[in-house]
């Protein structure tokens, strides 16, 4: 592709900014990043309260975040944030330690069995499911792997018929492999972080995000945070780009005619040679001249209704010294209840705590935002936390994905076969996963493959 091509990138979240960085590294200089919000970073969103930043979206990373680290180096930032500690609570708010055999001697047989199954899963992933961890989903439903290896920095292609098992939901996948207890480890950084319930989400999503090494870093609390929030990574990257993102851009229409791409911003038209879409593909047909294939495929996308509130505690009342995980609430039967509250700044009771809830599950009625918010705050009260006020809240369009049948029917292979048609390229969360490492990796690989 000619290096002087004019390229439009829709979205200035991790995916869009990663695409821009790697276009620059590949010698492209004529690109524009168009962002509808008034800030960059997407769901890496770190507002200020009382002089410090807190997290409303992405919170942490770990040493397997290779692509994010590359962006850190580009922007000149480091993971220099507060160390994260966590405790566990029952649904009644009372503290307990489900993983400590000294405090729970009756649980020793269960814990030993769980440890054995986790080890078994690690072995299976490295052998039976070789190739499971590479970026993107192309080939999985056909028993192949075709993605980016962040460890070597190379695109890897191969065959492994066992990978078809990743099309089934994670609960069934664990049952098939007789490692059901491993779910007790994976659920904390998965369901609590808003990515859905194990009996409805294809195993490929779970394991591409929480590959074995990443899962173990979460277990051992070998985690990265950022003093100025995850948003600061992308602010720094944006400042270093030759063409920083244009903010508050309202794209009204996109057409693809005469071998070019026409992007309408209000009543003005800008013409490009290529377009990379990192904004939600589910909504692409509402403003693109979408093909019938685009309409049909993108209509199959669903997403999680994941809500976050940032609250302060009443002065002089109990302020926890670490985050709290409520495993009992991470099941469909407790939909809408508090799954985790996040504590960021030690010994600073004037700082916020953030609450996290899921409102949707297949076959169950969607909880309303206000209904789930009340449930979460009532759960906070059970934890001994007396809420003063809400300083920030957000309803996220979160973790776009497809379900088992569409995954197995080759949804990803069909979308990947469309890459480059009508000078259009698809990236963002749906093409990989909803965490920042996978989205950043996918954009890097997309640029390497096509630009």
Task: Name each model-derived stretch.
Residues 5-32:
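N-terminal Rossmann-like FAD-binding beta1-loop-alpha1 element of flavoenzymes
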Residues 15, 39, 282:
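Conserved Rossmann-like nucleotide-cofactor binding loop
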Residues 24-48:
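Glycine-rich FAD pyrophosphate-binding loop
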Residues 26, 250-366:
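Mid-domain catalytic core of redox enzymes
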Residues 43, 51-82:
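Conserved FAD-binding subdomain of flavin-dependent enzymes
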């Amino acid at each position: 592709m000619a290096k002087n091509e004019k390229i439009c990138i829709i979205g200035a979240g991790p995916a869009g900014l990663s695409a821009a960085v790697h276009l620059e590294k590949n010698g492209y200089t004529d690109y524009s990043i168009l962002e509808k919000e008034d800030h960059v970073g997407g769901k890496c969103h770190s507002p200020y309260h009382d002089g410090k930043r807190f997290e409303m979206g992405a919170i942490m990373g770990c040493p397997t975040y290779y692509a994010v680290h590359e962006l850190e180096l580009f922007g000149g930032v480091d993971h220099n944030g507060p160390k994260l500690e966590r405790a566990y609570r029952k649904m009644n708010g009372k503290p307990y330690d489900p993983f400590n055999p000294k405090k729970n001697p009756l649980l020793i047989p269960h814990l030993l069995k769980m440890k054995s199954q986790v080890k078994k899963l690690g072995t299976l992933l490295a052998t039976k499911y070789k190739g499971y961890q590479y970026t993107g989903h192309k080939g999985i439903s056909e028993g192949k792997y075709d993605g980016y290896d962040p460890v070597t920095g190379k695109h890897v292609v191969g065959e492994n018929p066992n990978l078809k098992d990743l099309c089934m939901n994670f609960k069934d996948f664990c049952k098939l492999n007789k490692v059901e207890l491993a779910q007790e480890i994976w659920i904390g950084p998965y369901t609590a972080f808003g990515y859905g319930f194990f009996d409805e989400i294809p195993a490929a999503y779970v394991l591409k995000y929480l590959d074995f090494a990443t899962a173990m870093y979460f277990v051992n609390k070998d985690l990265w945070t950022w003093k100025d929030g995850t948003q600061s990574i992308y602010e720094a990257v944006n400042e270093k780009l030759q063409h920083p993102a244009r903010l508050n851009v309202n794209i009204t229409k996109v057409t693809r005619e005469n071998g070019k791409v026409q992007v309408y911003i209000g009543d003005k038209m800008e013409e490009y040679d290529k377009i990379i879409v990192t904004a939600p593909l589910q909504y692409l047909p509402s403003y693109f001249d979408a093909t019938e294939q685009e309409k049909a495929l993108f209509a199959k996308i669903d997403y999680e209704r994941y809500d976050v509130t940032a609250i302060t505690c009443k002065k002089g009342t109990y302020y926890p010294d670490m985050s709290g995980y409520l495993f009992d609430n991470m099941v469909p039967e407790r939909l809408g209840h508090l799954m985790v509250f996040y504590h960021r700044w030690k010994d600073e009771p004037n700082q916020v705590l953030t609450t996290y809830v899921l409102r949707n599950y297949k076959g169950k009625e969607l909880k309303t935002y206000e209904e789930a918010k009340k449930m979460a705050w009532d759960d906070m009260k059970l934890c001994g936390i007396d809420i003063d006020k809400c300083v920030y809240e957000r309803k996220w369009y979160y973790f776009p994905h497809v379900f088992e049948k569409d995954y197995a029917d080759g949804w990803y292979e069909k979308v990947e076969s469309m890459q480059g048609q009508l000078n259009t390229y698809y990236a963002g969360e749906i093409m990989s996963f909803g965490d920042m490492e996978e989205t950043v990796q996918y954009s890097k690989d997309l640029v390497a493959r096509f630009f």
